[in-house]
Amino acid sequence: MYHIIINPVGGKGESQKALQTVKKLLDAKKVPYIVHETQHAHHATEIARELSREPDTKIIAMGGDGSFHEVLCGIENFENVTLGLIACGSGNDFIKKSGHPKDVEKALDVILKGNVGYVDYMDLGTTRCLNVAGGGMDVDVLVKYASVKKLKGSAAYNYALIYTLLHTRFHKLRLIVDGKTMDKSVFMIGIGNGGFIGGGLPICPHAEVSDGKLDVVIVNEMKKRRIPSMLLKFLKGKHVEDKTVEEFRTDRVIIEALDDSRFELDGEIIEDRYLDIKVVPNKLKMFM
């Protein structure tokens, strides 16, 4: 039995199209399944929590990084659960590093073949993160995007991006790594299990989802006239070669906002201004 968890209105209608494809294929193969449609924010977490209490539970999470995040946060007993991913959300960044197919039929085929592997995730005490925890410019864009009322979809996001770049600011953060405290003024920071954000921006290009490490990339304050060229480097994952950028691996990092900066986990803005992030290596069992 497969338990499908899906946001029925997610992905600008793509979730429903993908669900119909999956149901048709499963019905043709006479594979038993139950569809759990989420009704409100964090409902996927509640559903996953209940399902994970039963042994040999096969969960198919359908959606984007936010949906995968919610399902991960709900798992109580990792030994009971094997998780399959079908990406059909507005942001599908985790699969760019995990190797899961983007095509719905191919992703389902991976699940039905039954081959499993284990991936890392990030533990923050009260929550978890599968892909990237971030701060700085990308969060400023998300905050502005959430406030745009007259535009929708990509038009709203592009407006938020342009607005943020025209009003660039740097963020005062404190990091503690391996007992060393560092106060930074940053343009952007990414702490990655996966490596991509924003639908394809490789902020942590060297991250691997099963290496037992967090990849930390810090883009430090720079002259504002350099920002356009830095963004071009971002598109190719070449920003880590720039002298203003620091990149290192660790198994734990503490990050604290020293100003009004906010953070995001898997593309979702959070209110916490102090994050204690630890990698949990090879814990999450997935169809791969």
Regions found by a protein language model. Name each.
Residues S15, V177, D183, E208, ...:
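ATP/nucleoside-binding phosphotransfer catalytic cores, i.e., glycine-rich phosphate-binding loops
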Residues M1-I59, C73, K180:
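ATP/NTP phosphate-donor binding region
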Residues K29, N77-F187:
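Catalytic core of DAGKc-family lipid kinases
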Residues G134, D138, G190-I203, I269:
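Glycine-rich phosphate/pyrophosphate-binding beta-alpha loops
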Residues K149-A156, P205-R225:
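Gly/Ser/Thr-rich active-site loops/lids in small-molecule metabolic enzymes
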Residues P8, M62-G64, I86-C88, N193:
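Glycine-rich beta-strand-to-loop/alpha-helix junction loops that act as flexible
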Residues S67-E79:
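Short Gly/Thr/Asp-enriched flexible loops that form oxyanion-binding sites at enzyme active sites
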